[in-house]
From Swiss-Prot:
Keywords: Chromosome, DNA-binding, Nucleus. This is Histone H1.C6/H1.C9. It is found in: Nucleus; Chromosome. One of its GO terms (biological process) is nucleosome assembly. Its main location: nucleus. GO terms for cellular component: nucleosome; nucleus. Residues 11-87 have a biased composition (Basic residues).
Length: 87
């Protein structure tokens, strides 16, 4: 058992050096990851700004059609009555 405990102790300092090298690689990978994260973030607001004007008129048109139908429904019978005798 004492022999088995000795090799892990020797291996731990060896593992420490790769760990030191790993953070350097991780730092290099983190910077590009941040750049890629910023690009989609910039594109998403632009897409929202572009889509918003298209969606808002569509919603406005729907709201206008609903209100227009209500007004037209009120005005339509009056116009129909007026147009009927003229025809």
């Amino acid at each position: 058992m004492s022999d088995a405990a000795v090799p892990p102790k020797k291996a731990s300092p060896k593992k420490a050096s790769p760990k030191k090298a790993a953070p350097k690689k991780a730092v290099a990978k983190k910077t590009p990851a941040k750049k890629t994260a910023k690009k989609p973030a910039v594109k998403k607001p632009a897409a929202k700004k572009r889509a918003a004007p298209k969606k808002k008129p569509a919603a406005a048109k729907k709201a206008v059609t609903k209100s227009a139908k209500k007004h037209a429904a009120k005005k339509a019978p009056k116009k129909a009555v007026k147009k009927a005798p003229k025809k």
